[in-house]
């Protein structure tokens, strides 16, 4: 390449442990040699979050709001052991949760598929992107044990002082049981719908919303009605122009359809369904090391991309002792490519779009040519059968990717 590609503004968030080391290698070997970025860096490593009382996480989220593109390295969410290990002031919340609460939006998870990595569901030849509505329902419910006979009722008290409305949930006549009250808000469901429609348009894939509205006629019916209304008013013509579609499906029918399908669609799930199905689908594709996670905000302009896995602590402990590691960087690389691709789309930057796509192609082609990390070799051969000659270590694999990217870009005369 004769000159670097002008990449525009990107918010970059550094992370923890082995993924932090990989993150620096990605920048050094795959991004910075080719792209000139107006980079806004925030250190979300656990020590710096503690030193700033987690203000750095909030600052990073505000920066993403301002510049519309964020790329994030995996971070530690501390438990008691981590509080002790790092002598933290307190058990800081998940940075992902903090960022999501500030930005809003929906998290979409997508598998990165290589032909030579076996899938548990062999028919899935294209990704299934799961969008989880990460608000309300069971996760913000009030539940309790009913100690004995009696009535459980739910009451709505209007703010304007008009008549209260009370609903009988159940009349416990023979002993106690359990009860729960849960909720969601129209605004949150609307945001979820917009993010889902935006994602479908950006991928050019159909969108399905799954609920159980035959049983929860009012509750799940509200999700169905809001999605349909927004689709008809704002997205239907765009979908038809792209020859894609939106459909509501019952959750049980949708699960069966997904198993039989070849993939290649967006699946919008309510909170609990998304929690369960995203892990189920991830496992079906074979490896969490090959799973991207993108937060899409309802404005369709603001996106934050990251790997769907953790900080790979076990490998970091080996690295600290000077032992060889073979850590898969692919999901972290795709956090960068998805962020850069979105920047390219916002700025109509064709060179940057080509670069992001080329780096994704190189990542997949390198693995399909037989150069991979140990976790992927284990997917193919089974861990007990893996020899050292079957895989590259962390640094060898990054070098191989760098070498192949250089060749691809030279061939493209970019």
UniProtKB/Swiss-Prot annotation:
It is an enzyme of class 1 (oxidoreductase). NADP(+) binds at residues 75-77, 82, 260, 310-315, 328. The keyword Phosphoprotein applies. Substrate binds at residues 77, 94-100, 109, 132, 212. GO terms for molecular function: isocitrate dehydrogenase (NADP+) activity; magnesium ion binding; NAD binding; protein homodimerization activity. Keywords: Acetylation, Cytoplasm, Glyoxylate bypass, Magnesium, Manganese, Metal-binding, NADP, Oxidoreductase, Phosphoprotein, Tricarboxylic acid cycle. Mn(2+) binds at residues 252, 275, 279. The keyword rRNA-binding does not apply. It is found in: Cytoplasm, Cytosol. The modification Phosphoserine is found at residue 389. It catalyses: D-threo-isocitrate + NADP(+) = 2-oxoglutarate + CO2 + NADPH. GO terms for biological process: 2-oxoglutarate metabolic process; glutathione metabolic process; glyoxylate cycle; isocitrate metabolic process; NADPH regeneration; regulation of phospholipid biosynthetic process; regulation of phospholipid catabolic process; response to oxidative stress. Its EC number is 1.1.1.42. Homodimer. This is Isocitrate dehydrogenase [NADP] cytoplasmic.
